[in-house]
Amino acid sequence: MNMHEPLTGLFHSSRLMILNFADIPADTPPVENLQRFFEDCEKRGLNPRLPENRQKFNNHLLERSRVRYLVSRYGEDRKGMLTGSKIASQGRTLHMGVDIFCRDLETVYAPCDAAIVRTGREPGDQGYGYYVVLKPDNLPGIHFFFGQLSKDLPGVGPIKAGQPIARLGDFIHGENGGWSRHLHLQMVKTIPREPDPPAL
């Protein structure tokens, strides 16, 4: 099943850019090319993995591109980008969801009628931070995982399409796991026991 099929209204009328980090031309300016951004930061003695530096990169690309969202591709191999991170040490470099990057701490809405079946937090840096798991009413055996949220999470129970779930978490104090501002969205079939996060 295509992840976007049950989410037909999620990106409707939104201004977005689909990112494929591996295909960004090598001769684009450093601020628009993630690999060259990393190299340029390191030359200047800056840490490109700090979320505040990544957020500056995202904000500039959003402004230059005149879009509201940057959306990563499903199934990306991010080994190069995650070298030395906790995620890489756990073998979690293949990105099994989509990331939706933005400038502000936007509200996340339920894409369909569903039940909130679990909320939680993956502690530490370079994790999912606060998260919510939805069980859609019309998709048996499927759950939606929303990660990188704020600490103000909803309670478990039913939710209608279009109702707010939470807001995006900030990188300040590691609320969202220590990343630039974005939503991690993933479909999962099984939910492991706590405290393991239900996504990869």
Tell where the protein language model's regions lie, with residue ranges.
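Short, glycine/small-residue-enriched coil/turn segments at secondary-structure junctions
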Residues: A88-G124
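Small beta-barrel nucleic-acid-binding modules, principally OB-folds
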Residues: G91-R92, M96-I100, F145, K189, ...
